[in-house]
Amino acid sequence: MSRKLRTLMAALCALPLAFAAAPPAHAADPTTMTNGFYADPDSSASRWAAANPGDGRAAAINASIANTPMARWFGSWSGAIGTAAGAYAGAADGRDKLPILVAYNIYNRDYCGGHSAGGAASPSAYADWIARFAGGIAARPAVVILEPDSLGDYGCMNPAQIDEREAMLTNALVQFNRQAPNTWVYMDAGNPRWADAATMARRLHEAGLRQAHGFSLNVSNYITTAENTAYGNAVNNELAARYGYTKPFVVDTSRNGNGSNGEWCNPSGRRIGTPTRTGGGAEMLLWIKTPGESDGNCGVGSGSTAGQFLPEVAYKMIYGY
């Protein structure tokens, strides 16, 4: 069904409700406004495959990774963020596809881990950046993963820093609800081995989860979908018991095809997981991390930087060795 026809049908179906109270700005369902997910033609895997057509690994990387819909990450490297986010959302919209975007620029990013340290120069700089991010997407349908690791990275932070971070996330949700009404925003909730369900439920709630569409799990990690689903349900049980609501969640399945070996930073022998789809035990299973992109200078990516595409790692991940 074409985008225009779906939009017209939705409008016609809504006519009997014309005098009902307006739904909240973030209530639109972008999955019904599009026809499948957007595969980024300029992902690191796509660029490598295009630049190395004679490499014996290129065909497999192109077929199994580059052509799979996955997220594009946005941060300080993205230039004018409103323009960058708008161009990406617009390209997907032009193909009637749903894009997945990751906002990864919070002030004091990866403060305790360090492998991906950086982010905006100050809380006010981040507020401006995230407002422009949301404004760039505008009314186009999109999925946004909001600041991976931001609620798990508390181990070395003092209470004032935690309050500051939660305030930045709450403000980000306000911006998306005001400016991007057809975007589903998922606050990142780390992974099942980072914080217990009760702790994560509290952190999510205090950072404004009620204003978000849901939360994300396992971003850039390797833990099985089953373990993440059990954890997501446990977080929701805590949310229901403590605060009276639950939220849908998504799981990053890009690199969890054979689970975790206990290491999180470029472990060997990992395998790609279920390609991006709706359902599957969560609201969506998404490729949020690009398989083959380094976690940092560690493991089988020794000597690399976070985000660098490593073709040999990508190739081996297709087959799990």
From Swiss-Prot:
**What are the protein's UniProt keywords?**
Carbohydrate metabolism, Cellulose degradation, Disulfide bond, Glycosidase, Hydrolase, Polysaccharide degradation, Signal
Its GO biological process annotations read: cellulose catabolic process
Q: List the disulfide bonds.
A: C112-C156
The GO molecular function terms of this record are: cellulase activity
Which class of enzymes does this protein belong to?
hydrolase
Q: Which InterPro entries match?
A: Beta_cellobiohydrolase (IPR016288), Beta_cellobiohydrolase_sf (IPR036434), Glyco_hydro_6_CS (IPR001524)
- Catalyses which reaction(s): Endohydrolysis of (1->4)-beta-D-glucosidic linkages in cellulose, lichenin and cereal beta-D-glucans
Catalytic residues (UniProt): D110, D149 (proton donor), D295 (nucleophile)
Keyword presence, Transferase: no
State whether keyword Hydrolase applies: yes
Query: Could you name the domain of life of the organism this protein comes from?
Result: Bacteria
Question: Could you say which protein family the record assigns here?
Answer: Belongs to the glycosyl hydrolase 6 (cellulase B) family.
Q: What does this protein do?
A: Implicated in the mechanism of induction exerted by cellobiose.
| Name of the featured protein | Endoglucanase 1
From which source organism is this entry?
Streptomyces halstedii
